[in-house]
């Protein structure tokens, strides 16, 4: 079989370059490659992660419909889900798993990458990452108890969660 590739212009790459994004060269200026990750990590503190176009619905799932309802801080006076949900102590899996799913899908990978990229050469960024990591993860362990913390992304780990006591000791060491 004969396969022929042609293009209609010699500057195809220039025409199809996305000028709205950040280039690799831009990331090197003023340590942006580290600072950008810190912004994402900060969004995980009370989970205002922006899925685009100003959508901030994860906060409602991770906070309002979960802990706020369970603790009685917030209550929906209108029957929702047949009148049986977290404010009536009928815990809803989708609401209760939201903080875990969002944190481990979007925030903790950025923490992991930031720690690895800054540990040796950029101790200031590494220190800020560690502080933000505690700010993000203390809420997760307070919600769930044992969490995956010290062995996150360890290919040799069997993903046994750390006890809450071990996590808090790790926070302060």
What do these predicted regions represent?
Residues 9-172:
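Short acidic-aromatic linear motifs embedded in glycine-rich loops, typified by GG[WY][YF]DAGD(H)
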